[in-house]
């Protein structure tokens, strides 16, 4: 996922998420409670395709020659098995987009639930964005802004 942001490659970003045609589950995203309230119906039917649309909308607003940066400050395994895993991570996503009214940095914590797809690639099937402070701009907020 970090490489997908570095390269601003939506196909590589999409490969991070479970697809029901190749995995036992479909992808689901749970935004922070604050973002769920703020962006209303945007997250109601959020899917793998929503992730692709958000990423492409964000990429379209980043000037040529610039790139986004995703950093996981901590990445802790909560559970590891041969076909599934759960991680908790703190993140900073910096996106030098051109929309003045939207913050360029999202920070927070996420819980990632992964499974091995039919090709034995690890993919996210559930992503829970966890609030870290009432005033912080989270990844959920960035998705809410660019996922519309």
Regions found by a protein language model. Name each.
Residues 84, 88-94, 98-148:
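Short beta-strand edge/turn micro-motifs at domain boundaries
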């Amino acid at each position: 996922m970090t490489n997908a942001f570095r390269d601003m490659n939506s196909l590589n970003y999409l490969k991070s998420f479970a697809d029901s045609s190749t995995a036992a589950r479909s992808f689901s995203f749970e935004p922070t409670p604050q973002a769920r309230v703020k962006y209303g119906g945007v997250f109601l039917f959020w899917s793998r395709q929503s992730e692709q649309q958000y990423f492409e909308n964000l990429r379209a607003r980043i000037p040529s020659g610039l790139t986004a940066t995703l950093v996981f400050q901590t990445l802790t395994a909560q559970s590891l098995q041969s076909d599934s895993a759960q991680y908790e991570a703190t993140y900073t996503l910096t996106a030098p987009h051109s929309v003045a009214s939207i913050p360029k940095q999202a920070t927070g914590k996420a819980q990632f639930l992964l499974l091995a797809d039919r090709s034995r690639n690890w993919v996210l099937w559930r992503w829970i964005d966890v609030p870290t402070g009432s005033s912080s701009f989270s990844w959920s907020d960035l998705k809410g802004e660019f996922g519309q």
